[in-house]
Amino acid sequence: MRSGNLTDWGFMKAKTIWALTDGKAGMINQARGLASAIAREMGGKVVEKLVVPQTPWSFLPAGFWPPGISGAGYGSDDIGAPWPEIVVSCGRHAIGPAVWIKRKNEGRTAIVHAQNPRTATRQFNLVVAQSHDALKGANVIIVQGSMHDITDGSLSAARQKWSDKFVGLPRPLVAVLIGGSNKTYRMTADVTRQMADDLLRMKAANACGLLVTASRRTGKENWMILRDMLSQPDVYFWDGDGDNPYQAFLAIADAFLVSADSVNMVSEACFTGKPVYILPLEGGAGTKFERFHLEMRDAGHTKTFVGD
């Protein structure tokens, strides 16, 4: 059985490692985090590369993409020689370009894919997949939760930068990390109102402060509901302007409430070692998300938020 050392998988020392994604934040964070971890072992400079799909390819499964990088459009980076020794790809739209890069470099570029590629794993030198995907293969390494670029150093820097901003908020300080609807979960206006009401009751019962951030998936209507209902004393609601305080929330908060739709945010909150509670949304039954949450609860990493 091979160890976790990349040399045991046939990898050579690297000068350059490309972190290749379609530009979505969740994909970038995973590719960056995995590429940085590889660089610490194998050497090399991490360079982030974007291959942003143009219409109509952005709406189609990765298998329908044209060959190589011909489906990449506005916002994409230049993809050409000199080629890297290692490509870390993440997301379905990065698979075709990663395989094309390896072919252009006559097999001298190794591909490490983060997440379940939903295609033949033999195309990659290594696949690092999450346990709830239940993926198997000779070149598959399984991890619990998603990979990310959060480190002790980045949290320390964020704490130093932002600590004065939240000094007036009471302790304990609870960070609320809210995503939104996806293919599995629905975050309706009614669910959002109930969520905000539960947060306020929890705040009153525990005399705590709240740090709240939402995402693009939250949607405008839900975002406005949260903003209006949570405009209360001892609540910091990030409105999206200026620098993103997300890592500061991770560094400074004493506990976390995270909406069920985001494996990434749950995994990043768990990295801190602080209590993490999951905010339920409509949906999820019988899906890989449900498997993920069961695994995390069974391992003692998370609990379900019940309103207090």
Feature names for model-found ranges:
Residues 293-308:
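Leloir-type glycosyltransferase catalytic cores
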Residues 48-50, 128-129, 209-216, 280:
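Short internal beta-strands
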Residues 24-27, 246-289:
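A donor-sugar binding/catalytic signature common to diverse glycosyltransferases
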Residues 19-20, 24-142, 148:
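Active-site and donor-binding regions of nucleotide-sugar-utilizing enzymes
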Residues 181-214:
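Conserved catalytic-core segment of nucleotide-activated headgroup transferases in glycan assembly
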Residues 13-18:
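Extreme N-terminal starter segment of soluble prokaryotic enzymes
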Residues 121-188, 305-308:
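A nucleotide-sugar donor-handling region in carbohydrate enzymes
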